[in-house]
């Protein structure tokens, strides 16, 4: 398994832990543990990337891995990072970590909120590590569903309207 796949595996383990968690303390414990692991992994990745670059590695994508999923259509799970994606992974991990604590006192449907928040993080992290168009689009679509629900259920103001606008904006033709 490639190191980059950890950024998808940790949120998947968080989902399993949240699914089994009973009580608010267990839910918060799973979220803090997972968010901390993501933040640590992103800091480690940043230092690994900077170490590779300072050692003279000039490859376009570092830590690349390709796994063929469906041969007739040449669909594969292709991941790798460049400088921008490393920075975006680090920023996303910081946002997941701080978002966990910002939602600390959320009471209605706490478990469901954190399940969708974690599902969103799978899509975001997967999007930033993907280097194949199919993989990128798959993770982008994974992120859209939780984003719609997080805005529509836990948002404020005209949340239903805004969630529809946010989801339909990338596909709207003008």
Q: What does each model-found stretch correspond to?
A:
Residues 2-3, 18-101, 105-115:
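Transmembrane helix-loop-helix hairpins at membrane boundaries of multipass inner-membrane proteins
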Residues 3-10:
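C-terminal regulatory domains involved in ligand/effector binding and gene-expression control
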Residues 169-174:
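Short "domain-exit" segments at the C-terminal end of structured domains
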Residues 11-15, 96-97, 119-124:
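Hydrophobic, membrane-inserted alpha-helices
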Residues 8, 79-80, 93, 129, ...:
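Short conserved micro-motifs on helix faces and helix-strand junctions that flank
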Residues 14-18, 98, 148, 152:
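Hydrophobic transmembrane alpha-helices
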Residues 16, 87-88, 137, 146:
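Hydrophobic positions within alpha-helical membrane elements
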Residues 24-26, 116-119, 123-168:
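Alpha-helical multi-pass transmembrane bundles of energy-transducing inner-membrane proteins
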């Amino acid at each position: 398994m490639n190191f980059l796949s950890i950024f998808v595996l940790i949120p998947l383990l968080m989902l399993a832990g949240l699914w089994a968690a009973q009580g608010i303390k267990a839910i918060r414990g799973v979220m803090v543990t997972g968010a901390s692991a993501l933040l640590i992994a992103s800091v480690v990745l940043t230092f690994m990337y900077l170490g590779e670059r300072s050692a003279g590695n000039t490859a376009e994508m570092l830590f690349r891995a390709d796994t063929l999923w469906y041969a007739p259509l040449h669909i594969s799970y292709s991941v790798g990072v460049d400088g921008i994606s490393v920075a975006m992974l680090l920023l996303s991990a910081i946002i997941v970590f701080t978002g966990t604590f910002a939602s600390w006192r959320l009471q209605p449907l706490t478990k469901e909120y954190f399940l969708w928040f974690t599902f969103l993080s799978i899509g975001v992290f997967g999007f930033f590590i993907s280097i194949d168009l199919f993989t990128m689009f798959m993770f982008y679509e994974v992120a859209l569903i939780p984003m719609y629900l997080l805005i529509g259920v836990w948002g404020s103001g005209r949340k239903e309207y805004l969630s529809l606008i946010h989801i339909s904006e990338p596909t709207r033709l003008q």
